[in-house]
Amino acid sequence: MEASAGLVAGSHNRNELVVIRRDGDPGPKPLRQQNGQVCQICGDDVGLNPDGEPFVACNECAFPVCRDCYEYERREGTQNCPQCKTRFKRLRGCARVPGDEEEDGVDDLENEFNWRDRNDSQYVAESMLHAHMSYGRGGVDVNGVPQPFQPNPNVPLLTDGQMVDDIPPEQHALVPSFMGGGGKRIHPLPYADPNLPVQPRSMDPSKDLAAYGYGSVAWKERMESWKQKQERLHQMRNDGGGKDWDGDGDDGDLPLMDEARQPLSRKVPIPSSQINPYRMVIIIRLVVLGFFFHYRVMHPVPDAFALWLISVICEIWFAMSWILDQFPKWFPIERETYLDRLTLRFDKEGQTSQLAPIDFFVSTVDPLKEPPLVTANTVLSILAVDYPVDKVSCYVSDDGAAMLTFEALSETSEFAKKWVPFCKKYSIEPRAPEWYFQQKIDYLKDKVAPYFVRERRAMKREYEEFKVRINALVAKAQKVPEEGWTMQDGTPWPGNNVRDHPGMIQVFLGQSGGHDIEGNELPRLVYVSREKRPGYNHHKKAGAMNALVRVSAVLTNAPYMLNLDCDHYINNSKAIKEAMCFMMDPLVGKKVCYVQFPQRFDGIDRHDRYANRNVVFFDINMKGLDGIQGPIYVGTGCVFRRQALYGYDAPKTKKPPSRTCNCWPKWCICCCCFGDRKSKKKTTKPKTEKKKRSFFKRAENQSPAYALGEIEEGAPGAENEKAGIVNQQKLEKKFGQSSVFVASTLLENGGTLKSASPASLLKEAIHVISCGYEDKTDWGKEIGWIYGSVTEDILTGFKMHCHGWRSIYCIPKLPAFKGSAPLNLSDRLHQVLRWALGSVEIFFSNHCPLWYGYGGGLKCLERFSYINSIVYPFTSIPLLAYCTLPAICLLTGKFITPELTNVASLWFMSLFICIFATGILEMRWSGVGIDDWWRNEQFWVIGGVSSHLFALFQGLLKVIAGIDTSFTVTSKGGDDEEFSELYTFKWTTLLIPPTTLLLLNFIGVVAGVSNAINNGYESWGPLFGKLFFAFWVIVHLYPFLKGLVGRQNRTPTIVIVWSILLASIFSLLWVRIDPFLAKNDGPLLEECGLDCN
């Protein structure tokens, strides 16, 4: 879509549409079309048969397949044509394979039975050997990890190719062609020693030399390039450069197209010296826990039975919570990407880029809490991303229908015409101007050109003027006119009533409008505000994201999408290419539903006392999940596959037979594998859905493996097959009453309908964002962002994993995205409250991981992780009780354990050692610092006794009484002094429980010490255990305490009054029940013999 001349607003229900943009949308650029003489599997030339005619593998449909792929498919694959599924017949000159029909004629016994002499001159030595032998040349193991290629003496060498015209006739050699199709051939090549010379092959004098490629200028140039690379490779081997043979090298002079065929990413397992001790300690800790609980249960405390029982229940709950959190971290991995290989394969210089298009989603609600300048920086970083501009579209969702956001976006589009060419010209990072100009670095380093200095200063002045204009709009928006806002042409702003307004779309930038100052094209920038009417449930952020999915499908329909919060800018301009290394990888990409990046933050104090960075979760838990089925979706910084969001199952892959012993029962093997795969229930599906694709079938260019198993694209007669499997009525019931959108869902590789005009597309876009479009459809249930929780991200990722998809965790060296985090504790607790409330809502919903999704594609340990993510708020009750126990013990003089024996002390000490050892080894393999680990432990207690507790009760009220709770948007970025709000405490009831706990434990410590002084030295021994227990609570609440008394007594008086009152009442109650005064031990009257009468 091109840039629009005006705002398009309308309501499908009211049959209204205003300001239609002009026609002339050229549409997305099509990918390079391949002719019929190119192999549709590997991309090489089809070549000729021994008679000099074009090689035809399948006599039924003449599907273009080269001889090498034909022989490999017959030998290693399904032996069927990829298009018509007809079994390949043996052709003259090919070896016989099991299953071939008996033939009467004897034409070539040598080829038929593969009788050949390896020293025969008809063979060619395979010489193109790449240093990274571990990838791209071998098979694939059960987990999809490429294995090193092993030479097979029964596999003949390649025998087709082209002759080289600069070699004497008596030394003509046949060299396999590696350059066709962009280097996408993936079938294994036979092993040969590169030190051997190229074996000559005689030419048939009866054939024309052109049949062998003789005299080809292109081949001559490629041969010269190949010779040079072979010389470098031979020299590297002679110089002891064999270090690269294990795949660890990074030599750019290795054979080019070998590099282009290599995987785009690889797994990097944690070294065994780091992960194995960690696993051993976990097992030891489980054993120690068993003995510990045996002692605790078998040794109650008679005089403090209630305290003992409460403590044991809390400890058992903590142990179960630890198991749910620990075992998903059993298989942590890291990943590497190869951007150079991605460039070689899909983005060659001087050629049309074949990288997949991507749609960016930015969501915002309230411009007063989410400053427009912050949103503008996010949009600018997207428009300047290092990606082909015709492949990028940015959609900004304004769920508040604010004219301020609309005008700020208009100003941003104008400034982008200057900012984007500056970023790409000098390759600056980051490409958000606010953060680029705030960098405290020497910007002259490696930038010695005087014109860069001048242009940087000029651009900084331009940005300062841009900020002035944005701030002026913000100041103007503070005073709302009584009659409402009006646009520049005097038209009333359609969104004056936030709860009742039509849908609005404005295209600011595009292909035919809004070029930058250098005349280059800019990415599309589209403003979207969905329709809102009273009486409709709009589902907050999840509903806004689903509206963006639909409107983007109508206008651009990119196969991939990336969603960002308005305060998360792109810090690494190559982040999208990092994600494409997984999404577009021919080996693993088809089953990847999304690529999640970690969240990194700016503006956090060095000590991070409120654990805003969440390093433990992003650098430990998420790495562990990546080794199972992938990380959970965290709401931002995630690249999605559009088809996965449409609720389709992941493509089924045919795994090679395992090399395990068949003498064990199947159920025993499953138990040993942690139950990753359960026996699948029999379903009555069409045969076309039951057919599994071979490794070669999934590598095709012409017909990519469709995630649904429902639609096959690109093959003749596919339209008839679609009509037989999926009818239009069912699709409209699933996706909604929009024929244009339904048609877009059938295009796995994206793209819009060329027959539709821009005006009709805009009208359809208004229709799909209407408030009633989702009624009686699967939106929010099976499609898109899932409804039912304020944490829609967890539900959405969970549904995709249940469909068998896997996700990828990508951690580039330069953080991909950065955002802002709440500075003060009150905002941080409200943020955690919202997350915990969403988990409670999921727990009481139909999508609870405890009972949903069995028999699907969700793995066992992945389910553990999801269960942990929704039950953790319930830990707040035992945590609150356990943190209260030290004060009770000190006030009453009792304790939760009896007097410890030597054996009991051994179990207690062993448990403490295992706890510390687990943390230390976890930090060792993950690289997390002890400060971050300890801050995470502290905030686990602070959030547990405040936000998680309130979320639990609010969730119960919502489920039982139907009382809905609303959340407020966390404030993003401000102009205040750095860290000025660090100690600011805003009034919130969340502050009362931790303050009360602090006062209770301080009172308990004072009371315990006073009691010990009154009763003498003997009482000091038991006191140490109680004091340690109390100090454990106080130390975990220390960041809260420091903020409470940190600066200028900013703590609200009402918080202090309520906390003191509750602590005093609680303490006096226990004193009244069981005072800690010394009891009278005088003689009994019956024993003293005195008659008092």
UniProtKB/Swiss-Prot annotation:
Cofactor binding, per record: Binds 2 Zn(2+) ions per subunit.
GO molecular function: cellulose synthase (UDP-forming) activity; cellulose synthase activity; zinc ion binding
Zn finger spans (RING-type): 39-85
InterPro entries the UniProt entry points to: Cellulose_synth, CES_Znf_RING, Nucleotide-diphossugar_trans, Znf_RING, Znf_RING/FYVE/PHD
Taxonomy, superkingdom: Eukaryota
Family that this chain belongs to: Belongs to the glycosyltransferase 2 family. Plant cellulose synthase subfamily.
Protein name, per record: Probable cellulose synthase A catalytic subunit 3 [UDP-forming]
Annotated organism of origin: Oryza sativa subsp. japonica
